[in-house]
Structure formats: structure tokens, C-alpha cells
Curated annotation (Swiss-Prot):
UniProt keyword Repeat present: yes
Protein name as annotated: AH receptor-interacting protein
Organism: Rattus norvegicus
Alphabetized PROSITE patterns for the sequence: FKBP_PPIASE (PS50059), TPR (PS50005), TPR_REGION (PS50293)
Repeat (TPR) residue spans along the chain: 179-212, 231-264, 265-298
InterPro entries with a match to the protein in the record: AIP/AIPL1/TTC9, PPIase_AIP, PPIase_dom_sf, PPIase_FKBP_dom, TPR-like_helical_dom_sf, TPR_rpt
Domain of life, source organism: Eukaryota
One of the GO BP terms on file: protein maturation
Phosphoserine: residues carrying this PTM: S43
Length: 330
């Protein structure tokens, strides 16, 4: 261990062990998954915190050998055992890219699209993107790079093949092979009533396909083929959101499908249900009418939805009348 710390020091990294770990130092061969909490601090006397994974409620997961954008994290993680807590003071040469990495991690923590920022955009938008990271502290750090302290608490180290790999860590070939399996897992979870977990699986499968689609020319046969795989997954995701009563997300996604495929019966039906739930009666009726036009066999189901909508509207009208009577009776 002394030799390891000496080599780190030669490379501009000073390690200080706060709590010893347990067992032997893992081999950390390529594909090993390290799960840890991290805290990033300024190296000045105040040592103010820049980022803290505990505050976000989810630890960091790093796959060794996947060329993470902040190589120093892979370097320091390789020196740690499970249960160990340590601080690493890293020279500027190791921390220059931290602001960009931190922005991505913050986006993920806020539940934003993991592909956000990777899509094509106009030159002006790209110029703005490069000039600002959207966080004042990260902008300041990018303009004035400095040594940083990484406080790492190693929770778990898993060897290759002993864990389910996250989509973002997969190669293109691995993504393509994983999508059907993730889709099946989502279906199983939905059947068992685990709707939130099913939605997460569908989301992962969509993210895999979107990532592959970004590498194709829009409108090309390969791009269209991937889009046709995305659509049923997105409809399943919308079904989960209907159950979770997140209706506006359903409206958004179903509309995006119908902008491309205006004969998709399931998208009209789910959007109609979402419109009905948020009292957009005319829009709901129009979508249900389109369902009947495209598939008359669904008449019994559509009739049931329309009756339910009419009953809710009558009930709401009666409640509104009672409320107004109460107001004017005072």
C-alpha cells in the first residue's frame, strides 16, 4: 500500500485514508463495477463542498476500463478496498474536466434526459453551450481550474459478470442485445404491479436505442428501424405514466409519436385517456373518434371511456353548481 501511495504522489495525487477498508485490495480488472459516495471539495482552507452524492441520495457507479471522462477517478478508486473512506488531493492536470463531468452527473441526479446535450443543435446554441455549463460554480471552475479534493467512501466492488450492467456503460453491440431483455423485464414488472420499476426499465431500453439512433442519419433505413423499436417501448412507458397519473408526460410522448406515425391507434387511445383525465373533453373525444376510425373493433372499449368521461363531467358540473350556490348564499 505504501508503494501505491508513493506512485500516486508522483502523479500529483495525495491520498489520506480516513477509515480502513475490509479484505484484500480488489484486482479491478476491466469491467469491475465500483459503487461509492463522493464529495468534491475546494482545496483552499475553507474546503467548501462543490458536489455531494449523498445529498442527491444515490451513489456513483463506475465501470473500470470504460474510459470515464474523469480518468483520475478510475486511478484513485483502484487503490481502495470495500468499506474504505479516503481523501485524494489531485493536481490541476487531473481536475480540468471535472466541471463537464459534474454537469452530466447533476443532470442525471435531477432526472433529466441522460442524452441531453448530445443532440444536434444550431451553431449559436452550441456556442452558448460551450461558454456556460448552466451552473455558476462550475463555470467559475472551468474558467479557473484548480486542485480539488475527492472524498470517496467505497461501498461495493463487483467483479465482471456478477452484476447487471447499466445501459450507459454498454458498447453499441451490448445495447442492441440488451434491449429485448430489458423490454421483457419491464413487461414482467408491469404484470406484477411494479409500475415504477417497469417504467424505469422501459426508459433504459429507450435510452439504449436513442443512443444508437443518434449515430444514424435521420430518416435513413437504420434510423427508421430503430425508431420503430422505440415506439412500442415509449407506449409502454406511457402506460406506466397513465397508471402513475402523470398525464402531461403521456400527452407529450403520445403527441411526439403521432407527429411521426399518425395512424398509431395505441397512441391516440392513451392520449385520449390522458386528455380525459385532465378535463380536455373535446381533445379526448377527438382522439377516441380517431381510434374508432382506425380500428372499429375497439368500439366497446372507446364507448366505456366516453361514458366514464361524460359521468365525470356531469359530476364536476354538479360540484361546481353546489360550490357556486354556497358562495352566493352567504
Amino acid at each position: 500500500m505504501a508503494d501505491l501511495i508513493a506512485r500516486l504522489r508522483e502523479d500529483g495525487i495525495q491520498k489520506r485514508v480516513i477509515q480502513e477498508g475490509r479484505g484484500e485490495l480488489p484486482e479491478f480488472q476491466d469491467g469491475t463495477k465500483a459503487t461509492f459516495h463522493f464529495r468534491t471539495l475546494h482545496s483552499d482552507p475553507e474546503g467548501s463542498v462543490i458536489d455531494d452524492s449523498r445529498a442527491r441520495g444515490k451513489p456513483m457507479e463506475l465501470i473500470i476500463g470504460k474510459k470515464f471522462k474523469l480518468p483520475v477517478w478510475e486511478t484513485i478508486v483502484r487503490t481502495m478496498r470495500e468499506g474504505e473512506t479516503a481523501q485524494f488531493l489531485c493536481d490541476v492536470k487531473h481536475t480540468v474536466l471535472y466541471p463537464l463531468v459534474a454537469k452530466s452527473l447533476r443532470n442525471i441526479a435531477e432526472g433529466k434526459d441522460p442524452l441531453e446535450g448530445q443532440r444536434h443543435c444550431c451553431g449559436i446554441a452550441q456556442m452558448h453551450e460551450h461558454s456556460s455549463l448552466g451552473h455558476a460554480d462550475l463555470d467559475a471552475l472551468q474558467q479557473n481550474p484548480q486542485p480539488l479534493i475527492f472524498h470517496i467512501e467505497m461501498l461495493k466492488v463487483e467483479s465482471p459478470g456478477t452484476y447487471q450492467q447499466d445501459p450507459w456503460a454498454m458498447t453499441d453491440e451490448e445495447k442492441a442485445k440488451a434491449v429485448p431483455l430489458i423490454h421483457q423485464e419491464g413487461n414482467r414488472l408491469y404484470r406484477e404491479g411494479q409500475v415504477k420499476e417497469a417504467a424505469a426499465k422501459y426508459y433504459d431500453a429507450i435510452a439504449c436505442l436513442k443512443n444508437l439512433q443518434m449515430k444514424e442519419q435521420p430518416g435513413s433505413p437504420d434510423w427508421i428501424q430503430l425508431d420503430l423499436q422505440i415506439t412500442p417501448l415509449l407506449l409502454n412507458y406511457c402506460q406506466c405514466k397513465l397508471v402513475a397519473q402523470e398525464y402531461y408526460e403521456v400527452l407529450d410522448h403520445c403527441s411526439s409519436i403521432l407527429n411521426k406515425y399518425d395512424d398509431n391507434v395505441k397512441a391516440y387511445f392513451k392520449r385520449g385517456k390522458a386528455h380525459a383525465a385532465v378535463w380536455n373533453a373535446q381533445e379526448a373525444q377527438a382522439d377516441f373518434a380517431k381510434v374508432l376510425e382506425l380500428d372499429p373493433a375497439l368500439a366497446p372499449v372507446v364507448s366505456r371511456e366516453l361514458r366514464a368521461l361524460e359521468a365525470r363531467i356531469r359530476q364536476k358540473d354538479e360540484e361546481d353548481k353546489a360550490r357556486f350556490r354556497g358562495i352566493f348564499s352567504h
